[in-house]
Structures are given as C-alpha cells and as structure tokens.
C-alpha cells in the first residue's frame, strides 16, 4: 500500500514539519508556499511541532487529527484509506554525537519497508520497519493526519 505524493525539499534546517505539511496539502490540491505555512505554524529556529501544524491547517479550513501516541496499526489503517501521516522521528548524528528531531511523511509500507517522503532530501526513501519504529518511538509515536 502506497500513497503517491509530490516531494518538496525544506529550504531551512528547521522547516521539516512545515515542508511535510506542504507535501500533504499539495496531495489535497492546495498549494501553499513554505514561508506562509511556516508563519501559520509559528515556526522558529527550533522548528514547529505537529500540534502547531494541526492548528495551522485547521485555520486554513482543513481537518487535522493530531495523534500524540499513534500506533503502527493506526498508521497502517490510515494508509489503507489512502491517507498519509506526518510523523516525528529521532535522527542520530554520529559525527557530532547528537540526536535531533525530524519530521517525515509516511506514504507507504511494503515488503518490510516504510516508505517516507523526507523533506531533508526532497525525495522518497525507504526505512527498514524496525529502524523506523525505533526512530518514531523515540519521539513518542506522534503523528498528524490532514483531511479535507
């Protein structure tokens, strides 16, 4: 099961949530510039939260479901209905020895791989299921679903 999405690349290191929102909104037929979404999400140099993103899309007239403790089963069910989920994940930087937060759009699960649109590279990438689950769990399994 896979939802076809148009990837966008984030223009700043802290606009991953905003760019994920742009990807999902584009799939719903709405084209918003990154700067407008960043402002609506109250984005600052530390980024934006999925909760802020949910409030922003509601103010734009969309329905949003912020899931503070989503499950893999919930994620799978949304995908089966053709709805991608924005999730927060932990990303390790072994060079600098730090872990940072990042957001990606989960658009599919196939053959033990989770397919995500990663705004850091502006493209799809595949993650091993266990790698994805570990990274997602480290950010409390947060998710955001946007609907018309």
Model-derived features with residue positions:
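Sec-exported extracytoplasmic/periplasmic mature domains
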Residues: 25-30, 58-62, 137
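Noncatalytic regulatory segments and standalone regulatory/sensor domains
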Residues: 43-48, 80, 90, 97-98, ...
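Short coil/loop residues immediately preceding or within conserved phosphate-binding loops
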Residues: 101
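Active-site-adjacent structural segments surrounding the nucleophilic cysteine of cysteine proteases
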Residues: 1-47, 71, 86, 91, ...
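Helix-adjacent hinge/juxtasegments
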Residues: 55-81
């Amino acid at each position: 099961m896979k939802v076809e999405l148009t990837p966008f690349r984030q223009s700043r290191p802290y606009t991953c949530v905003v760019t994920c929102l742009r990807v999902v909104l584009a799939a719903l037929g709405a084209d918003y510039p990154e700067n407008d979404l960043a402002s609506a999400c109250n984005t600052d140099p530390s980024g934006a939260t999925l909760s802020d993103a949910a409030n922003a899309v509601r103010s734009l007239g969309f329905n949003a479901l912020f899931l503070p403790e989503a499950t893999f089963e919930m994620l799978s069910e949304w995908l089966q209905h053709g709805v991608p989920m924005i999730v927060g994940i932990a990303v390790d930087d072994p060079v600098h020895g730090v872990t940072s937060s990042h957001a990606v759009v989960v658009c599919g699960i196939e053959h033990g791989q989770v397919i995500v649109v990663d705004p850091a590279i502006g493209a799809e990438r595949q993650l091993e299921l266990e790698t994805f689950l570990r990274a997602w769990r480290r950010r409390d399994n947060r998710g955001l679903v946007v609907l018309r």
